[in-house]
């Protein structure tokens, strides 16, 4: 026995003694050597476990420590949630509900995204963008604007434009799985009378269109012919689709109109507060037969449109087609 070794008596269960005996024989060493080795290893093992545990905690904390990317993404996410909660339908919307909507199993990780502790995957960010009507390029990479303004010209073919306004968007899975419930035609209260069209789905997703149309006399020949077509399109929508899709028209100040066009606000935060003003219904309709004065110059424009709408042969051919009611590109 070494001078440094200390002898002491240890009472152990008989079953444990038998296991030590068997292990000593298997390892070809004495019972004392076997017991000493196992005691020593148990302390080393505990030290190793502590080191591994420390590494796990360190990695966990590092993973949840804010980085510049996490901070930027969290700022965007909090902006999106803030804008969404300004809308009546979403004013009590929570991160947990958002996590459920995008098929997360729990809300724990989603809440960590908003605190800049974890970074969502690109796929998760794309789902959030779809469910909140946000521009994915902005949410993922900070490019463009938070809300996409689609600068488009109507095709000026009824079938195509009815599909554009009333049909679901086949290029977006979330939109394609929902139906359009409402269309808003918003005219700027200005001399030119620019136009924004909002296409609102049953799931409250929204698409924003900004066609180069002026609802006014501030038009060249081509622009005025496009305005006549626009009147034909809206008359068809009101005649055949209003029972399935709500069609509203509004007037909006220049300041608020331009704010929507910046793409920095959710359009419904402004549009849902507007009152319905039926200028779309009345612009190419001779009834009611009285001045309506929706804006300065409305009644003069209306009189001109009524005259030219009736004089355009191709418009009258379409509008008076006895089979027009059968030519619906959208089925509900």
Which residue ranges define each predicted feature?
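Short Lys/Arg-rich basic patches
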Residues: 1-16, 21-29
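Short, basic amphipathic alpha-helical segments that act as recognition/interaction helices
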Residues: 29-50, 145-146
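Short amphipathic recognition helices of helix-turn-helix/homeodomain-type DNA-binding modules
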Residues: 39, 138-157
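DNA major-groove recognition helix of helix-turn-helix/homeodomain DNA-binding modules
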Residues: 122-138
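Recognition helix of helix-turn-helix/homeodomain-like DNA-binding domains
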Residues: 7, 101-120
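Long, charge-rich C-terminal accessory regions
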Residues: 162-295, 299
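Charge-dense, extended regions
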Residues: 275-332
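A short, Lys/Arg-rich alpha-helix, primarily the initiator
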Residues: 1-5, 52-101
């Amino acid at each position: 026995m070494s001078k440094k070794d200390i002898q002491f008596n240890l009472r152990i269960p008989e079953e444990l003694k038998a296991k030590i005996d068997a292990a000593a024989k298997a390892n070809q060493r004495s019972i004392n050597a076997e017991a000493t080795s196992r005691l020593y290893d148990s302390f080393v093992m505990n030290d190793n476990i502590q080191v591994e545990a420390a590494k796990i905690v360190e990695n966990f904390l590092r993973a949840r420590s804010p980085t510049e990317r996490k901070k930027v993404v969290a700022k965007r996410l909090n902006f999106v949630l803030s804008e969404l909660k300004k809308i009546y339908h979403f004013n009590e919307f929570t991160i947990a509900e958002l996590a459920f909507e995008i098929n997360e199993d729990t809300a724990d990780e989603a809440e960590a995204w908003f605190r800049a502790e974890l970074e969502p995957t690109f796929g998760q960010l794309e789902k959030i963008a779809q469910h909140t009507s946000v521009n994915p390029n902005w949410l993922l990479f900070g490019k463009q604007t938070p809300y996409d303004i689609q600068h488009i010209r109507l095709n000026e073919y009824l079938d195509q434009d009815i599909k554009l306004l009333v049909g679901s968007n086949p290029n977006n899975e979330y939109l394609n799985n929902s139906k359009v419930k409402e269309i808003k035609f918003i005219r700027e209260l200005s001399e030119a009378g620019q136009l924004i069209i909002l296409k609102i789905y049953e799931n409250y997703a929204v698409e924003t269109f900004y066609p180069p149309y002026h609802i006014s006399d501030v038009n060249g020949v081509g622009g005025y012919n496009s305005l006549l077509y626009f009147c034909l399109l809206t008359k068809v929508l009101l005649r055949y689709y209003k029972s399935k899709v709500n069609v509203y028209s509004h007037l909006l100040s220049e300041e608020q109109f331009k704010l929507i066009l910046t793409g920095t606000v959710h359009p419904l935060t402004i549009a849902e507060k507007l009152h319905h003003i039926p200028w779309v219904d009345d612009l190419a309709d001779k009834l009611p037969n009285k001045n309506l004065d929706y804006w300065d110059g409305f009644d003069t424009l209306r009189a001109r449109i009524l005259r030219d709408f009736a004089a355009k042969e191709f418009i009258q051919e379409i509008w008076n087609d006895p089979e027009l009611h059968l030519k619906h590109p959208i089925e509900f």
